[in-house]
């Protein structure tokens, strides 16, 4: 751990999101064994992912942002509120522009700018859209540690990366399985499934670098990442987690995911 502590925050963020990317790849790997996962299982897994993201948004991002804002010239609630709204608006803008397709939807229901891209490409872009704020959150968390603020700890940043990695497993499955079900080869389904997570290391570097270059934006950056993550949860994960019609599965999964992430953050952070 001491060797990891001595690395630059950008390298730490890269390693942290390298783990989360690896978990996306691991989640894509079941296509080598089965062609389909029961919808009920997917609903529970996606609910779990939603719970992890909600907990991470508060415990790892919003709470530190509020604490950092206390004692400043502005009201303590203002920087986190502004950053949170901007994060949601940013993701909403990308959602309107980037062509993508939600899981289980027909090609006619594709969102964003009109395109002739194949269904599989649109599915991959949808999950890639999920992963950007997750990578950004990890990068900002490691950047905050380098800023030497008491509310930001290396263990907390590691806990966030661990939680994001855990919830990336079902997201990898959610990309790879539909591709396999539509007739794509096992190898291609796996390849595109893991590829959806490649945006996380890129976003992490952006987040860590932004915080290092401008420390005063840290409360805004943390809450920005939280707003973007909550947008993804409400816009995509929760609806996708209820496709079987049994809302209890998604709800129980979300409760479990929230609890796991809360334990990780409190125990390690």
PLM feature segments, named:
Residues 1-269:
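Intrinsically disordered, metal-sensing/regulatory segments
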């Amino acid at each position: 751990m001491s060797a990891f502590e001595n690395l630059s925050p950008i390298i730490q963020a890269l390693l942290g999101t390298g783990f989360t990317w690896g978990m996306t790849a691991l989640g894509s790997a079941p296509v080598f064994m089965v062609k389909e996962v029961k919808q009920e299982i997917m609903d529970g897994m996606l609910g779990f992912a939603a719970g992890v993201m909600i907990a991470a948004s508060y415990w790892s991002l919003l709470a530190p942002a509020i604490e950092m804002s206390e004692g400043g010239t502005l009201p303590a609630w203002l920087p986190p509120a502004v950053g949170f709204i901007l994060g949601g608006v940013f993701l909403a803008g990308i959602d309107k522009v980037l062509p993508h397709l939600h899981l289980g939807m027909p090609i006619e229901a594709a969102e964003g700018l009109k395109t002739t891209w194949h269904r599989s490409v649109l599915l991959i872009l949808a999950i890639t859209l999920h992963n950007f704020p997750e990578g950004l959150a990890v990068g900002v968390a490691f950047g905050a540690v380098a800023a030497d603020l008491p509310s930001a700890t290396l263990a907390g940043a590691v806990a966030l990366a661990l939680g994001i990695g855990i919830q990336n497993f079902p997201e990898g499955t959610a990309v790879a399985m539909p591709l396999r079900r539509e007739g794509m080869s096992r190898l291609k389904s796996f390849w595109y499934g893991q590829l959806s997570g490649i945006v996380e290391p890129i976003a992490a570097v952006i987040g860590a670098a932004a915080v290092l270059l401008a420390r005063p934006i840290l409360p805004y950056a943390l809450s920005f990442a939280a707003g973007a993550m909550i947008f993804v949860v409400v816009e995509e994960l929760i609806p996708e987690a209820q496709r079987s019609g049994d809302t209890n599965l998604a709800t129980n999964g979300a409760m479990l995911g929230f609890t796991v992430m809360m334990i990780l953050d409190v125990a390690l952070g």
